[in-house]
């Protein structure tokens, strides 16, 4: 047990109470079902051996009793079950945090959230509220809500675009996992990211709702890092930062039928912030709606970056309502200076329609060192409606049109603005 505690401490730097519980989790998953002093888990005697209700393990749904130990004790049973098992959060309001659900588990695991889970406002030694790690074949489902209580910490968040900064805790992090299904749940007022997928593979997210005020800092809806084969479908994201941000080393990502806004748009990046970042490829955004977002469809890379690539990125069939900066590639993002070394190529913006509050409909501002190649802008019809939206202007609308720098841009189809001069 001491060795397990030491390993977890080095890996996660978490507090002593969580270390003890984490050690129990690891021990339970390899010790033939033994639980707390050699007693067998409850599965053998339960009337429904595959469903474990957190209230049977001490959770109190009064909104004020910290139930994180009940969550972890329930998880021990679920993870150790030899048959597929469900951790159930029933109706009620449960205060908890932080919670670590660690695997590997013996069988498929479902976490079914019906009630509301409220985060504590302090006591976080780790950068997440709920962490799922090494739990393959996980299903997170239900009609319930994760309330991050971000309003308690947003004023103290001074990260902005700083190179080095410790963000407040992410609400839901999934790390080192394969074959994950997330559907139906809601996340409200995350302290920072609502969801963060890192080193994951084969993840399907659908029918979720993520919300936070437009002014809440760094509250990305879903952030990906080294994530492969991810689908984000049929969801609503209204938050204070990117609705979806696709980060380094992510490949084969599909975003479809997502309503985004308020927020900072649907973004690839920022890329190039860290050393030796892996390439990004196969990002396809289709049939999405953007409402009063600060940016629309964006690719952003840091100046002074190490070399990497961002290729095969497609934004198609997008509706925009009073969107600022509808189409933008920004290779001077952040505060570091110097030319970006992220090579951007094979990019498509097609069938983008609606209204904008920015006269520069298209801004393709690429790196002098590695100019963008193969950027296609096709069938973009956006009407300028003034700085605050409202009445539709004439089709000319006083638009500046497109701005292009260090980029090979190919325009085609019907355009509502003047093209970049060749």
From Swiss-Prot:
PROSITE patterns in the record: POLYGALACTURONASE
Entry EC number(s): 3.2.1.67
Glycan-modified residues: 229, 252, 287
UniProt-annotated catalytic positions: 241, 264
InterPro entries: Glyco_hydro_28, PbH1, Pectin_lyas_fold, Pectin_lyase_fold/virulence
Main localisation: secreted
Keywords carried by this UniProt record: Cell wall, Cell wall biogenesis/degradation, Disulfide bond, Glycoprotein, Glycosidase, Hydrolase, Repeat, Secreted, Signal
Keyword Glycoprotein: yes
Protein name, UniProt field: Exopolygalacturonase clone GBGE184
Organism: Arabidopsis thaliana
Similarity comment text for this entry: Belongs to the glycosyl hydrolase 28 family.
Catalysed conversion reaction: [(1->4)-alpha-D-galacturonosyl](n) + H2O = alpha-D-galacturonate + [(1->4)-alpha-D-galacturonosyl](n-1)
GO terms (BP aspect): carbohydrate metabolic process; cell wall organization
Disulfide bonds: 243-260, 366-372, 404-420
Signal peptide (from-to): 1-31
SMART domains per record: PbH1
Cross-referenced PANTHER family: PTHR31375
Function: May function in depolymerizing pectin during pollen development, germination, and tube growth. Acts as an exo-polygalacturonase.
PbH1 repeat ranges per the UniProt record: 200-226, 227-248, 250-270, 280-301, 310-331
